[in-house]
Amino acid sequence: MPGAGSLKALNYLYNAAPRDGTAIATFARGIVFEPLLGHTEGTQFDAARLNWIGSISNEVGVCGLMRTSGIATWADMRTKPFKIGASGTGADSDIFPIVLRNLFHLPMKLVAGYQGGAEMVLAMERREIDGRCGWSWTSLISRDKALYATGQIVVTLQIALARHEDLPDVPLVTDLVDDPRKLAALKLIVSRQNIARPFAAPPGVPAERVAALRRAFDDTMRDPDFLAEAAQLALEVRPASGAQVQALFDEITAAPPDVVSMAAEMIRETR
């Protein structure tokens, strides 16, 4: 169910989907954080009330740019004008470029309206845009491996709470901020990467059915056939249980108000 960076799907899950355990959804992880940061337009859900089943992996987002753009390093991003593609509000491709532009005053133009990652990659190849920020590293090396392997795409920045072992020499965004309050706010925004591939059921599902869904998810994450297929597709499996995802939301909702306010301002200021 496409639309508005998963907003349509999540609103449906929360308000209209059956509440008997037969309806589950996965969606862009960033959208569930929007109301927590004060962006409530169009949202018809409370993420804390969803029945979280688990997340297949945590994630490292990257800024990936075409080599033809002339942007090859983080230093280049700070000094040379470039265009970045985006999809819907709340999607990583929208949120992370805005935060980067706001924090570091990048000479970046955001080109919104793309219907997903594949469309943005085509736009890059056509030179409509120069790249993407918030691009899932695992997606890049699986779906667009040829572009990266042939050197057509250059990775200039990691967007996560910790570096990926594949990218030891690529800067990590949280290492680039010295101000403690700004760093805390940035980490609040970036924490969505810890639930990179989330699954949830609507509120109101009977507890025993939620427990069954969680057990099935956990069993799948250990299933040899599933893991082998994921490996063939170059998709990482670093699961978080439903309880762990719920704990993350509990931690976020307990964040100090000044940190939440600053995180919201990082996104709002340059929208």
Regions from the language model: what does each represent?
Residues M1-N11:
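Early extracytoplasmic/lumenal segment of secretory-pathway proteins
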Residues G3-A4, F27-V32, G204, T270:
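PG/GG-rich flexible active-site loop of Rossmann-like NAD(P)H-dependent oxidoreductases
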Residues G5, Q115-G116, S241:
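Short loop/turn segments at beta->alpha junctions
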Residues Y12-A23, I31-R127, V173, V177-A184, ...:
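Hinge/capping helix and adjacent helix->loop/strand transition within the periplasmic-binding protein
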Residues T26-F27, S87, G113, C133-W135, ...:
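Short beta-strand and adjacent tight-turn residues that come in two discontinuous sequence segments
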Residues R29-E41, D94-L103, G131-L176:
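A ligand-binding cleft/hinge motif common to bilobed small-molecule-binding domains
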Residues A149-Q152, T156, L176-D178, V205-R271:
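An extracytoplasmic/periplasmic, membrane-proximal ligand-sensing/linker region
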